[in-house]
């Protein structure tokens, strides 16, 4: 009886594992589930895109006298990134099966690069605030931001071009590792400047409601963005070596749902909610046009 009792947990675990595996395979192979999940992602991205557009319009109506500020560009890029993702998942059948394969890579990777550019814009903004508060030079920060983004896009274009001419598994592996490295750089940027600005605000001698709000804003956005980019880095790196975890394929709808909800949809929605406050109508030191 004792031996039987000891075997029961293992047997139950085995049965549960088999049932979950069977369900996972059934869902992945079901056209109905595939369509349902990808259309759900389409709807989620469309909703976030609409929220970003509404917020952009509200900001423009609030301060129409200013040009393209960092805040406006950030919301515009969120609108574009999430809108493009919504279209891609809305036409998932055509996108995942498009030929040549390099074109499929372009369609699926480009929104991820735009997501990187949009959110590292926050890193740039915080870096400028931190440097100004420390009386450090800020003239090279935007040059660095632009240079890093240009380098990332040029490298990615090179990978796409090579895949177009010589499609092989080695180049695909390099492409995935490159995306993982780019995601790690973004996570590091948030940890570095988000963390610095957070601790600088904590040491600020004057206690005020505005300081507490800004502290909560910086801390929350830093934690969210660092986590989502780090998860993207790990998942993409692992998927490069494990075909069972391959993303952006029709027969892995559940994996795609979990991945994109965790690394893009939920972080975007949370950040837009946290940064929902409209800028003041009068000129502020924290709200200035992009030069």
Curated annotation (Swiss-Prot):
Q: Which Pfam families match?
A: THH1_TOM1-3_dom (PF06454)
Could you tell me which residue ranges are on the Extracellular side of the membrane?
A: 25-36, 100-104, 166-172, 242-253
Cytoplasmic topological segments: 1-3, 58-78, 126-144, 194-220, 275-291
- What topology does it adopt in the membrane? Multi-pass membrane protein
- Major location, coarse class? membrane
The record describes the protein's role as: Necessary for the efficient intracellular multiplication of tobamoviruses, probably being a membrane anchor promoting the formation of the replication complex.
Oligomeric and partner information: Constituent of tobamovirus replication complex. Interacts with TOM2A and with the helicase domain of tobamovirus-encoded replication proteins.
Name recorded for this polypeptide = Tobamovirus multiplication protein 1
Taxonomic lineage is:
Eukaryota, Viridiplantae, Streptophyta, Embryophyta, Tracheophyta
């Amino acid at each position: 009886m004792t031996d039987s009792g000891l075997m029961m947990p293992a047997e139950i675990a085995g049965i549960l594992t088999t049932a979950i595996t069977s369900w996972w395979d059934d869902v992945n192979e079901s056209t109905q589930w595939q369509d349902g999940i990808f259309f759900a992602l389409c709807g989620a991205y469309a909703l976030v895109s609409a929220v970003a557009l509404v917020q952009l319009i509200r900001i423009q109506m609030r301060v129409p006298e200013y040009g393209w500020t960092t805040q406006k560009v950030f919301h515009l890029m969120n609108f574009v990134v999430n809108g493009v993702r919504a279209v891609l998942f809305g036409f998932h059948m055509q996108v995942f099966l498009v030929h040549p394969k390099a074109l499929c890579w372009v369609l699926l990777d480009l929104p991820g690069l735009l997501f990187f550019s949009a959110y590292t814009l926050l890193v740039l903004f915080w870096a400028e605030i931190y440097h100004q508060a420390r009386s450090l030079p800020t003239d090279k920060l935007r040059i660095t931001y632009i240079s890093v983004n240009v380098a990332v896009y040029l490298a990615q274009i090179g990978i796409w071009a090579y895949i177009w001419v010589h499609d092989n598994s080695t180049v695909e592996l390099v492409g995935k590792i490159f995306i993982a490295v780019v995601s790690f750089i973004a996570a590091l940027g948030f940890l570095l400047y988000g963390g610095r600005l957070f601790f600088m605000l904590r040491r600020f001698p004057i206690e005020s409601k505005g300081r507490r709000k800004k502290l909560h804003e910086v801390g929350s956005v830093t934690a969210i963005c660092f986590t989502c980019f780090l998860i993207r880095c790990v998942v993409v790196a692992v998927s490069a070596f494990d075909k069972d975890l391959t993303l952006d394929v029709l027969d892995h709808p559940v994996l795609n749902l979990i991945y994109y909800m965790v690394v893009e949809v939920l972080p975007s929605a949370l950040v837009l909610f946290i940064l929902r406050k409209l800028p003041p109508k009068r000129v502020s030191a924290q709200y200035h046009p992009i030069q």
